[in-house]
């Protein structure tokens, strides 16, 4: 082979090797692209149903211990356009209560980072339900939890997290600086109401979708306060009740109509000899019903019902099945305040069904322990103490606390009625237990017209914690 032939042969071999290498590289790129398409296709494959849920794990390490802080559900393929929650539906017919959520916050907080809280409540939009709560600016099992039995301080804030999750710095959203609060969704945005400041001049700050839209100054300079549960929205307007004045005597009560975070109308109730605090409100057939706490002289609960023009009616639940705590043993009720054991009280709720009423109450008549749901078929208007259904929620040997109502609108559930729900606060720590702190977890239930069961769903944390020893 002469030199020219050698050069041609070597060049041909190099060219063939180069072409083969190029083909292999192109094949590698195609393989990677196909593999990536298959993986992302599996994660985002559209289903035949209306929505798919993609779950992302949010994990952390605490003191070398692996803690699963939360599972965040991202709704995919669902129309997230705004709707107006009309509130025109009636309450769904129900036969009992199915457990909806339990956050186990105190149990998890013995090792994980969980907020010291009280006054939790739940509110739902047309897309999700969230737990709102008042933090103490501290974590469980930490030195700053000391003295958190105090109700009002500059460190308290309203925050929220997905319902059923323990409230932690990793899954919670700041809402407002507040030691008294309310929140609700009108279908277009979240309204939050946070009250903070000194007892003799507190101010309520209203936010709509996180932006300050209005403020309300204390008008009696005596601990302006609000619901500690969700406000109620009807046809784009949201409604709340505020109290200012003595906790053990005649105070002043106002209904406020709020649109996109701005107060558009308010009235002061003409309610002599009535006492309204910490009302639990819900929409029903275009009106709003609120069942409240009488901390002055009633062991039964006062109520106020009003329309969108704030024309209102007032009364007390007549049933001899009393709903407050402390309270006397069940007996003869009254459509006015029942004075026996009427001083002091606890936040609570009831749901009216024509002349009947579902009453939520502690099992104990004197301490904040146990919880049960009672159906009194004529208790809204009659004073006897007979009832037909009792469903156990928390045993009398376990601590309970505040309770309140919330609803799930048809725009969320797909039902043609308003689903009634309630939450129960499970208080732990001071003043009843040997700790340096006060906090709570929560459970919630929703009304169903199918099988349910009575049981006890207590907080379940073993106290004291290491910080208490």
UniProtKB/Swiss-Prot annotation:
Catalytic center residues: 151 (proton donor/acceptor), 402 (nucleophile)
One GO term of the biological process aspect: viral budding from plasma membrane
GO function term, MF aspect, one: metal ion binding
Positions of region (Involved in apical transport and lipid raft association): 11-33
Region (Head of neuraminidase): 91-469
Residues given in the record as Ca(2+) binding sites: 294, 298, 324, 344
Glycosylation (residues): 50, 58, 63, 68, 88, 146, 235
EC numbers on record: 3.2.1.18
Keyword Secreted: no
Residue intervals on the Virion surface side: 28-469
CC cofactor note: Binds 1 Ca(2+) ion per subunit.
Keywords: Calcium, Disulfide bond, Glycoprotein, Glycosidase, Host cell membrane, Host membrane, Hydrolase, Membrane, Metal-binding, Signal-anchor, Transmembrane, Transmembrane helix, Virion
Residues given in the record as substrate binding sites: 118, 152, 277-278, 293, 368
GO CC terms, sorted: host cell plasma membrane; membrane; virion membrane
Location, primary (coarse class): virion
Record comment: activity regulation: Inhibited by the neuraminidase inhibitors zanamivir (Relenza) and oseltamivir (Tamiflu). These drugs interfere with the release of progeny virus from infected cells and are effective against all influenza strains. Resistance to neuraminidase inhibitors is quite rare.
Domain observations: Intact N-terminus is essential for virion morphogenesis. Possesses two apical sorting signals, one in the ectodomain, which is likely to be a glycan, and the other in the transmembrane domain. The transmembrane domain also plays a role in lipid raft association.
Subunit text: Homotetramer.
Family according to the record: Belongs to the glycosyl hydrolase 34 family.
Official protein name in the record: Neuraminidase
Source species: Influenza A virus (strain A/Brevig Mission/1/1918 H1N1) (Influenza A virus (strain A/South Carolina/1/1918 H1N1))
